C-alpha cells in the first residue's frame, strides 16, 4: 500500500504513480511465486484519488478466495498513523470482517540500523 494522491496530479504528469508501480514490480521480481498488488491509501474529500484503493481491495480479497494477506507500505520510511491505524488496525479489521483469516503487516524500516546507514550514505552523497 502506498500513500495516495489525487488523480488530477497523475493526469497532469506527476510521476509518483509510476514510481509506486515500478517499486512493486521490482519487489515482485524478488518473490515470483507470491501475488503482489499495488494499492493506494489515505484518500479524503470528494475528488478521485489513485486506484485501486487499499481499503476496497482488502474488503474484496476474501471473496476472491484470498484469505491470507501480508501488507507492506514501501512508500513509508517510518510507521505512522497511516500504517499503524489505517492499515494494521482498520485494514486488518476490515479484511477479517469480510471473511479473511490471517492478516499481518511488515513494519516500516523505522530505526533499523540498515535504514539509518542508508540514510547516512544518501546524506553524505548529497552534502
PLM feature spans:
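Extended amphipathic ligand-handling, pore-lining, and cofactor/metal-binding catalytic surfaces
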Residues: 1-127
Amino acid at each position: 500500500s502506498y500513500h495516495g494522491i489525487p488523480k488530477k496530479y497523475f493526469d497532469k504528469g506527476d510521476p509518483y504513480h509510476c514510481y509506486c508501480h515500478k517499486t512493486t514490480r521490482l519487489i515482485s521480481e524478488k518473490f515470483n511465486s507470491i501475488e503482489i498488488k499495488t494499492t493506494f491509501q489515505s484518500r479524503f474529500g470528494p475528488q478521485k484519488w489513485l486506484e485501486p484503493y487499499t481499503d476496497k481491495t482488502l474488503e474484496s480479497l476474501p471473496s476472491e478466495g484470498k484469505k491470507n494477506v501480508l501488507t507492506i507500505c514501501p512508500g513509508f520510511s517510518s510507521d505512522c498513523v497511516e500504517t499503524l491505524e489505517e492499515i494494521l488496525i482498520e485494514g486488518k479489521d476490515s479484511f477479517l470482517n469480510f471473511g479473511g483469516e490471517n492478516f499481518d503487516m511488515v513494519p516500516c524500516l523505522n530505526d533499523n540500523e540498515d535504514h539509518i546507514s542508508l540514510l547516512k550514505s544518501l546524506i553524505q552523497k548529497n552534502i
